[in-house]
Curated annotation (Swiss-Prot):
Its EC number is 2.4.2.10. Orotate binds at T125, R153. This is Orotate phosphoribosyltransferase. Homodimer. The lineage of its organism: Archaea, Thermoproteota, Thermoprotei, Desulfurococcales, Desulfurococcaceae. It comes from Aeropyrum pernix (strain ATCC 700893 / DSM 11879 / JCM 9820 / NBRC 100138 / K1).
Length: 186
């Protein structure tokens, strides 16, 4: 499928689940937005998350196949990483935003094998959450070359990750999703 076709399919699923919301929202980056993509709404319908999973595999399949593990960014990326890992029979891990103060004190959970991993999140905005996860992974001996997301909001994530030597791969951009929904730009 072309990038346009992938975006069209994702836009339909997002519309079906009411996952593109208008209003006044504060994003995890701290930025305000009049549009919010709530990927968690896809999780409540197996046909919707199955389609989204297939789209992630379409754009990230080669990188995922070469990876030693799939790593989710807590919390939005964790369900997608888990489904990808299960589908591909790959080890799964996730990065906590902060080191916990009890138990093993680990920030990388699941003890996935060291090597080249793919980092997965649901939506990329500025890329700060993904970048922090990559820094934690690298400091723990992992190699990261690809971050995979369903939607790139186009607010700097790709550029930030590129400066770290990481390629951001997305199913669609927010701009394209809004165009496919007939909403125009944000």
């Amino acid at each position: 499928m072309s990038h346009e076709e992938l975006a069209e399919v994702l836009a339909k699923v997002l519309k079906k689940r009411g996952a593109v919301l208008r209003g006044d929202f504060v994003l995890s980056s701290g930025r305000r937005s009049s549009v919010y993509i709530d990927m968690r709404r896809l999780l409540g319908d197996e046909s919707s998350y199955s389609v989204a999973l297939d789209l992630l595999l379409e754009v990230g399949g080669q990188d995922l196949a070469r990876s030693s593990a799939v790593i989710g960014v807590a919390t939005g990326g964790l369900p997608w990483a888990a489904m990808l890992a299960l589908r591909l029979s790959k080890p799964l891990g996730y990065v906590r935003p902060e080191r916990k103060g009890h138990g093993t004190l680990s920030q990388v959970e699941g003890d996935p094998p060291k090597g080249r991993v793919v980092v997965v999140d649901d939506v990329a905005t500025t890329g700060t959450s993904i970048a922090k996860s990559i820094e934690v992974l690298r400091s723990n001996g992992y190699t990261v070359g690809t971050a995979l997301v369903l939607v790139d909001r186009g607010e700097g994530a790709g550029e930030l990750l590129a400066r770290m030597g990481v390629r951001l791969v997305s199913v669609a951009t927010l701009k394209t999703i809004l165009e496919k929904l007939g909403w125009g730009g944000e």
